[in-house]
């Protein structure tokens, strides 16, 4: 009833077991139909002569009953309906009654004498008839038994697996699930099919199987068997049967272990460490078959020599138009070529050779049928045109040939010599059919290649079918015998099943299984009560048969090359075996054929000897572990399981898709960049319309290709670049929104950025000032408290309040985009760019490492401002008013250097005056930046840069976005900068920053467009700033003739480091808090009612700043910072400010610099340039730690280089602050300057000023309690900090920082 592929047929059983296998009844008991009196036993004498007449009478009656029962079973199995089940029930009950009356009669007449009969065939006949099996049971119990068989068969045959959340798409075992297991290489899809089938079928079968076991045992005990398993084993007529099998299994085990190790290695190459453990069992769903019993369907993954001709001829069969009928005709012709019988007309007229297309439910499991009328023999098979099925066809035709040859024997002898014989016959022929020589003869192989590599390919393919099956063929009945005997109780059904499967097969369940599952039931033979050890026996026998028949056919050479096609001698020898049926002991029949009466694995081992040796050599060469010592290992579940199962896993298709995306994206992104540039350099309504159109085109393209990207499962791709590109494309970003919402979102973004860019503030006389350059210059140069306050407040009142109405909807859309792309909120989406699960913790550690230096800088600057503005406006124990630090956002403080210079009499280190005096222009600034990069051996900017960039603010009246930005036009040659450059040292530094972006663009321009980004966003920000660290050194400014001296001495160094700290250290808390605020807005912990209050809470907490005038919830001060309305994440700048010092330290080392880090200038160092270029060339193609390692030699972000750079200044600040008795921090956190109090007193009488916010008294009281707690914590922290700094001072250095992430610099990145 089938061989190892799981597509197996029926073999003729003894009448009781035959009837058992035919019983399929309705759920509810019904009255038993009466047996026709003409079929009842008559009167016979109780002697051997009477027994002969009894046997003859039984034979004629049995043929009638068995024909009727088989017809009913056939009708049901080829059309599963309630009516057919009812008719089958009636026929089955008749069969049982027949077995009962004849069996009891045999016992009554011959029980004491039958074993002494002289006629051996008669002994076998009477012995068979007297075994009643289920017919021993009383009617009610018999009906219960039949009902269990019926329901188990129905559950298995109608089981389906439905696609998750799509009830309309359901898969049957055959062909859908079978095809998936055979052809899919998607780990998740295979898992879903495997788990779905085992759950759908196994779980409901368990209680039925438990009941079946109890009733079946009860029935066979009445026939003097200890349990059902003992009855099954009795067919093999050997008291040492189990021991013989164990001996044979151990003979074959080394070959299996070598095959297992080799296949496991191949699967590891495909699925990786995550899913395949080279020292563990193989997940059961990866081997090409639902039960991992034969592995030939994964031959393409394990083929030893893939350049040799393909031995899987499936594609040729399809190409040549083979169909099911033709496959059976080819098989028939093989049998007749041996002189065996052709199929009778009834076979072709009545068989079901394909799955019906008329909607009928059928039992697809392949099976061969004997109708016991000596002319009607059929096959039921849902045949698919594949090479594997061609072997199954020969297997089933082998059963039918057996039926034809023994059809004239007594019905009780119409069986194989033992059950394994019946399974072996068709497979013997399949061993010839599958040879390359035979495939060539039947037109399925163009030519036969006779060399060792082709032989190894062929033998490995055969081993995947034959050797892989052996432990499975052995263990199934090991488990059932344990169940029947009681050694395996129901509470351990599944545990023992998987114990055996791991022990013998070396496989494991791919998902957690427990005793609610019944995974044995997912195999046809368990619910259909078909013994399975026959297949193990047949796999040994068939090679013994093959060896003997090849000898008869005169074959010379290796056994695996033998083809007995057209050998009449072999056919005659085989016919003798078939015609004997089970009329003689199987040992005698075997000896007649092979010369030995014992099962023996020698012929099988001879057949596979070449590949056995090859596998051993391969495994030794690869250092494979034979076996699975880590037997408890289990694979994890895939991400997004089970939703992501129906995904494409073909890497070649993915490669073509990526190429298509890259080609089309470059064109579209170039067009979008042009439209965006036109708008940013000439803000008009017409330009905004064009930009929105192009933005929609980009979104549509992103949606189209992102949607296609989502159809790929990249988890097991071997090409890491394709994997990385597709994973990135799967994030659809804003394109995931429905068209109307996308249009609204784009409009909100455009409106917010336009509002920001076009805003200006006006005096009462009507004179108006834009942010660039007027307000920026005022904030940088004015030292008038009220003038600074007017500029600061007016900008926020004008811009922030105008942005606020858009912002809540922007947040809502941003979160919706993130969630639709699989993130928890927009903040989660932004953080994902850093590919770190610990990003927030790592950033916090870095911030904490730098906080002592910032607190010392803050205290020192506050003292200097107190000297200038007095105690009315500066509290030495409180926060600093935010408008006094030289910058609209107090993010960098270098513009107030003149107020805070440690040694004012030391030479000036600001090159602005010299630049103006020498007639520097914006173009000259960028030429010098370009020269710096080329001095390192890096690329010069192309001509397009100079022709198309906007390097200063236009004077033709155009409105432009002045915020500096670098642009990549995605054509490999057009790169531009947009900057309203002023001739000053700050803009010289910014120019180097922006040229850093351009250099990055040029270095990675040949990568796929998806990789044309920084390793992480902070990397892109850091590159230009690295150059600025060298450019800012007095040594380099002197080389540009911008300083009169290189400068030297302690005071000069401290002045220089102070100026750098006002840029770099002052910026750290600001760059950290902006996205702290936005992330909390996105996750909902900051609501729109508290936008401004929480903004100032963070600015107080991290920067130690307060608003100089009261702010209310009607204000929206975050919106006054470009990156907030422009939707540009900001933590990249924090990252870049950390990592630029790590890079600087590494490049200085490469340049051979010795001495303090702050004096290093890498100008003209080709070694430093190469180090940097190698990292930039990677773009986004590798995770950022790899790029970090290329430059610094290690993969982590760390503040140590930054601390090292500022070490002399840190020590000076600690000394200076101690000398003045400065407070570190701002314990009087609720203080506000007089301006705030004055304005606050004129406000509405029922509101009070709190932290510069204008709140209800109750709100303020709650806030005071919160801040009281913070104050106490800050006081404790301050005491600890003082102690820490004391220790630092004593040891002449700050503590080495904890290794963690890194950050970047303060200019908008526009290239994506």
From Swiss-Prot:
Q: Which PROSITE patterns match?
A: PEPTIDASE_M2, ZINC_PROTEASE
**Which residues are named in the active-site annotation?**
396, 525, 994, 1123
Chain positions found as Phosphoserine: 1305
Mutagenesis or variant effect for residue 994 to D: Abolishes peptidase activity but no effect on GPIase activity
Annotated chloride 1 binding lies at 236, 534
| Keyword Disulfide bond attributed | yes
Q: Which residues are glycosylated?
A: 59, 79, 116, 151, 165, 323, 514, 682, 700, 719, 765, 947, 1196
Q: Which cysteines are joined by disulfide bonds?
A: 162-170, 364-382, 550-562, 762-768, 962-980, 1148-1160
Output this protein's name.
Answer: Angiotensin-converting enzyme
Organism of origin: Mus musculus (Mouse)
State which gene encodes it: Ace
